[in-house]
Amino acid sequence: TIVVNLDSYSSIMAQNYYIYERNGKITILPWDYNLAWGGFQGGNASSVVNFPIDTPVSGVDMSRRPLIDKLLSNKEYLERYHGYLQHLVDNYFANGKFEEKIKALDALISDYVKNDATAFCTYDEYKKAVSTFITLGNLRAQSVQGQLDGSIPSTTAGQNANPSKLVSAGNLNLSDLGRMGGGRGNNMGFPGGIGGWQFGGGQQD
């Protein structure tokens, strides 16, 4: 929910997940998170920042996703789910841990990106992506917190009816994070094959 991974069960695609059953308990095992944070069918920046926590699906009705719908229809499980979201906001965003981790990873790889002659983006584009990711994460956490405390609608219907209550994405541009299907060169980033990231030219809020 927080990372808005729509290349999964929660979107019209309903893909990239396993269901594991053991002793009558079912566990959902999602995978392929490279298009999280709105990288897949995410729409504009505002729709990603304010993705509704209580109807966390895209392009499909909740009733078509019973693994989510049945869970959130149960009051006890809904409260527990909200508790997990609050824990993530408190322990990864509100305390600065998310931003700290991104900056630490940037410090590890920044020089390698700068000197990589085969990179899919320029160094300036990479640095812009880092700062954009930090902004996106913090705005997303702000919206989730508002949805949890009731100041922001937590369903698609509620948000459509009250757009003025949503967190503003400002001039945040998701394409600054890169998008699949591009890259440099005639083979979309890879010699002899598709892949890679393309930067710039995307939609703002």
Model-predicted segments: where are they?
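Middle-to-C-terminal accessory/interaction subdomains
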Residues: 1-4, 9-11, 16-204
